[in-house]
């Protein structure tokens, strides 16, 4: 058995699910260890993957929050008990606060631990676990200290490798195949900033819009809907990205990897570095440097959208060159080497 852990948000959960799917396809039994209250608590019951949820205290960027310390300790102890019972041959942690207890428990029990980092810099959980791990898989090349660099390998970001013909995808979503479609994503929880500031900018632009506002914001922003403008709490990402001609979003690693897989150029509004330590800004700059994305500017966003629509083919090619296709298989190969 191979145990996978990580989550809390979609950026950590979805790559682990993609690897789980690949491992199951190869005949390996898998088990998923997630966090109580994380996104996985809602999504895992809808999958065929056996799973358990444990407490997982949130890590702070400067020091462990006193009120979270008991949860962190409890989570590690619960994870240890579970791993002793399941006896997995290897553990993959995709990070996030949900991935720390299982990763630490694997290290304490001497079970081979493989980490996967999604962003253009190591996250807190992976930073803490990396010295203890047997392997470190990266989505993009990172500058690392020599001890970590020796066990690191760039594999890409695992995504659901599903595509649909563009015209078919637009029709399935109820859009005109002959008109460009702008897909707006604010991350798995939605972005209030994008939800509030974007609609006035889009008035009069020659685009259809599929706007994922986040489930908690659906009723508030439902009145935005009209001809060629759809509001959804959650979207089928492979279908939506297959249909879209241009993406406007935050700069989470998962969203960008999926956009690259679909060759979907993007206009990006990364989170403030005060909120995520600069991970999204680093992601956005990497994709912009490659030519597949630009950093959005509210004072000229209308022009940026029009410029992107006029230059779609070149930007599509640049984005597609960053495709993570095969990443789930490469991670599965690394895990099999531990068995």
UniProtKB/Swiss-Prot annotation:
Cell wall formation. Catalyzes the transfer of a GlcNAc subunit on undecaprenyl-pyrophosphoryl-MurNAc-pentapeptide (lipid intermediate I) to form undecaprenyl-pyrophosphoryl-MurNAc-(pentapeptide)GlcNAc (lipid intermediate II). It catalyses: di-trans,octa-cis-undecaprenyl diphospho-N-acetyl-alpha-D-muramoyl-L-alanyl-D-glutamyl-meso-2,6-diaminopimeloyl-D-alanyl-D-alanine + UDP-N-acetyl-alpha-D-glucosamine = di-trans,octa-cis-undecaprenyl diphospho-[N-acetyl-alpha-D-glucosaminyl-(1->4)]-N-acetyl-alpha-D-muramoyl-L-alanyl-D-glutamyl-meso-2,6-diaminopimeloyl-D-alanyl-D-alanine + UDP + H(+). It is found in: Cell inner membrane. GO terms for cellular component: plasma membrane. GO terms for molecular function: UDP-N-acetyl-D-glucosamine:N-acetylmuramoyl-L-alanyl-D-glutamyl-meso-2,6-diaminopimelyl-D-alanyl-D-alanine-diphosphoundecaprenol 4-beta-N-acetylglucosaminlytransferase activity; undecaprenyldiphospho-muramoylpentapeptide beta-N-acetylglucosaminyltransferase activity. Keywords: Cell cycle, Cell division, Cell inner membrane, Cell membrane, Cell shape, Cell wall biogenesis/degradation, Glycosyltransferase, Membrane, Peptidoglycan synthesis, Transferase. HAMAP family: MurG. It holds the Pfam family Glyco_transf_28. It comes from the Bacteria. It comes from Thermus thermophilus (strain ATCC BAA-163 / DSM 7039 / HB27). This is UDP-N-acetylglucosamine--N-acetylmuramyl-(pentapeptide) pyrophosphoryl-undecaprenol N-acetylglucosamine transferase. Pathway: Cell wall biogenesis; peptidoglycan biosynthesis. It is a peripheral membrane protein. Its EC number is 2.4.1.227. UDP-N-acetyl-alpha-D-glucosamine binds at residues 9-11, 119, 160, 188, 280. The keyword Lipid metabolism does not apply. Belongs to the glycosyltransferase 28 family. MurG subfamily. It is an enzyme of class 2 (transferase).
């Amino acid at each position: 058995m191979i145990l996978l852990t990580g989550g809390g948000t979609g950026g950590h959960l979805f790559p682990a699910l993609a690897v789980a799917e690949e491992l199951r396809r190869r005949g390996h039994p898998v088990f998923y260890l997630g966090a109580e209250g994380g996104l996985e608590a809602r999504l895992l019951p809808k999958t065929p993957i056996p799973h358990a949820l444990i407490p997982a205290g949130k890590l702070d960027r400067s020091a462990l929050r006193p009120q979270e310390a008991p949860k962190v300790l409890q989570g590690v102890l619960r994870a240890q008990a579970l791993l002793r019972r399941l006896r997995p041959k290897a553990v993959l942690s995709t990070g996030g606060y949900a991935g720390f207890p299982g990763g630490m428990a694997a290290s304490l029990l001497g079970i081979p631990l493989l980490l996967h980092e999604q962003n253009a810099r190591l996250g807190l959980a992976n930073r803490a676990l990396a010295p203890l791990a047997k392997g470190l898989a990266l989505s993009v090349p990172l500058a690392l200290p020599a001890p970590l660099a020796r066990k690191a390998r760039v594999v890409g970001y695992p995504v659901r490798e599903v595509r649909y013909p563009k015209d078919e995808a637009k029709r399935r979503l109820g859009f005109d195949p002959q008109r460009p479609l702008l897909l707006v994503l604010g991350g798995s929880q939605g972005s209030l900033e994008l939800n509030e500031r974007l609609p006035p900018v889009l008035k009069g632009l020659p685009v259809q819009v599929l706007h994922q506002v986040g489930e908690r914001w659906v009723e508030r922003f439902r009145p935005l809907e009209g001809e060629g403008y759809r509001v959804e709490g959650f979207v089928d990402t492979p279908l939506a990205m297959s249909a879209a001609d241009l993406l406007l979003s935050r700069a989470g690693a998962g969203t960008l990897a999926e956009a690259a897989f679909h060759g979907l150029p993007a206009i990006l509004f990364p989170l403030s570095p005060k909120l995520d330590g600069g991970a999204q800004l680093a992601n956005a700059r990497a994709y912009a440097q490659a030519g597949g994305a630009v950093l959005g500017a509210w004072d000229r966003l209308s022009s940026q959208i029009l410029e992107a629509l006029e230059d779609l083919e070149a930007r599509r090619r640049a984005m597609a060159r960053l495709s993570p296709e095969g990443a789930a298989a490469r991670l599965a190969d690394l895990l099999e080497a531990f068995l």
